[in-house]
Regions:
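Ordered alpha/beta subdomains of enzyme catalytic regions
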Residues: 1-142
């Protein structure tokens, strides 16, 4: 399956909703609550980030970047036009395919460390101003 389908439906319009001139979007993954943890547990263990980002890279390489641009982008146009009942503009996806990589920078805490609740474990930011929209577009997958 095309990796760009692995998002929440409403995020397919985010690229049009950011304020004009947006160039950078910085996002984080933070454990927000310990309400289901045993009483007195106020930390979580950081783990899995290396696997997730390696998987993300490999998945997009195999299911988007290594496939013909017309094939993957026309599939996106067809499905998203039906889903949104409009003639969906895929220019931003075509430009991403031309780039041939996900333009993001990821930072994470070391795996295995205990992290207090409400402390970010992972941050993600776009590395190309043109692709400010990709940061939160990928959030669902992460």
């Amino acid at each position: 399956m095309n990796g760009l389908f692995l998002t929440d439906g409403y995020k397919t319009g985010h690229h049009q909703q950011y304020p004009k001139g947006t160039e950078e979007v910085y996002s984080n993954w933070t454990p927000r609550s310990n309400s289901y943890a045993p009483v007195g547990c106020d930390k979580v263990v950081s783990f899995g980030q290396q696997y997730v980002f390696e998987w993300l890279h490999d998945y997009f390489e195999a299911n988007f970047f290594s496939k013909p641009k017309d094939e993957v982008c026309n599939e996106l146009k067809e499905e998203l036009s039906l889903y949104l009942n409009t003639d969906y503009d895929i220019t931003h996806f075509e430009e991403l395919h031309d780039l041939q990589y996900l333009p993001i920078k990821v930072k994470s805490l070391p795996e295995g460390v205990e992290v207090p609740i409400k402390v970010p474990m992972v941050t993600v930011v776009n590395t190309d101003k043109k692709f400010y929209w990709i940061t939160n577009f990928l959030e669902t997958i992460l």
